[in-house]
Amino acid sequence: MAIEFTKYHGLGNDFILIDNRSSSLPVLTPEQAIQLCDRHFGIGADGVIFALPGENGTDYTMRIFNSDGSEPEMCGNGIRCLAGFLADLEGQSRNKDSYRIHTLGGVMTPQLLSDGLVKVDMGLPRLLAGEIPTTLAPVEEKVISVPLEVAGKTWEVTCVNMGNPHCITFVEDVAAIELESIGPKFEHHPAFPQRINTEFIQVVRRDYLKMRVWERGAGITLACGTGACASLVAGVLTGKCDRTATVELPGGPLQIEWSEIDQRVYMTGPAERVFTGKL
């Protein structure tokens, strides 16, 4: 049976989207996802996203297989792409501008804006060491500006869970970071039992951050939505930035807000369809 797909990207963080609404289980295996994500012998992508039936009163369920076959809890750029994909699937029958989507990282609510961007209520950041998880602090304590030894250097790190785990460190110049060599050392550090996404952040102004990311299970990517959210939260916690800022990634900018009113994090950015096909 042929499986139709649509390729989307959010600031260059690219995904293969599958209409999986007829089954509560993904129609592809992690091994098949690895093959499809291969940029030389497959379609090429950072991950495969499945649109499944909703759970617990939600509209849909999102599951993701990374390019290495692992399954993350959530993906910020991915959920924006999923919102655009769902709007395409529903077509003329669509009667709403937002969706409640069940993910392994909690319920997320993307909203399709009139200018073509997608705004996502990413929920409350989780800050306790046990919620990351990490052994850098007791389970009921926050991990803010804690020293971490990686590759013979001491890095000051702050940890935030935005549906998936992030370790953020602030640097003078993100362009100078040798991401390909240092990224895996953070990801597989024993302080992070479930591995970790790592963001290197340069504060240009209090409302403008530059970011590079090493994603758990995907490596270097052009953008990471949950990482941008986690980085702004880390910047606020360490007094380095405002609660609303532009986060500039290699693939382009995201607008991030950590609301003082409801303490939830909101992300706004693009989701662009690239092409469709059949497997």
From Swiss-Prot:
Pfam families: DAP_epimerase
Site description Could be important to modulate the pK values of the two catalytic cysteine residues, residues in chain: H166, E215
GO cellular component, one term: cytosol
Subcellular location: Cytoplasm
EC number of the protein: 5.1.1.7
PROSITE patterns tied to this protein: DAP_EPIMERASE (PS01326)
Active-site residues from the entry: C75, C224
Amino-acid positions noted as binding substrate in the UniProt annotation, renumbered to this chain: N13, N66, G76, N77, N164, N197, E215, R216, G225, T226
Gene Ontology biological process terms from the UniProt entry: lysine biosynthetic process via diaminopimelate
Coiled coil: none
Reaction equation(s) it catalyzes: (2S,6S)-2,6-diaminopimelate = meso-2,6-diaminopimelate
Pathway: Amino-acid biosynthesis; L-lysine biosynthesis via DAP pathway; DL-2,6-diaminopimelate from LL-2,6-diaminopimelate: step 1/1
Keywords assigned: Amino-acid biosynthesis, Cytoplasm, Isomerase, Lysine biosynthesis
Annotated Gene3D superfamilies: Diaminopimelate Epimerase, Chain A, domain 1 (3.10.310.10)
Domain of life: Bacteria
GO MF, one annotated term: diaminopimelate epimerase activity
Record note on quaternary structure: Homodimer.
Sequence similarity: Belongs to the diaminopimelate epimerase family.
Role noted for this protein: Catalyzes the stereoinversion of LL-2,6-diaminopimelate (L,L-DAP) to meso-diaminopimelate (meso-DAP), a precursor of L-lysine and an essential component of the bacterial peptidoglycan.
UniProt-recorded name of the protein: Diaminopimelate epimerase
Protein species of origin: Nostoc punctiforme (strain ATCC 29133 / PCC 73102)
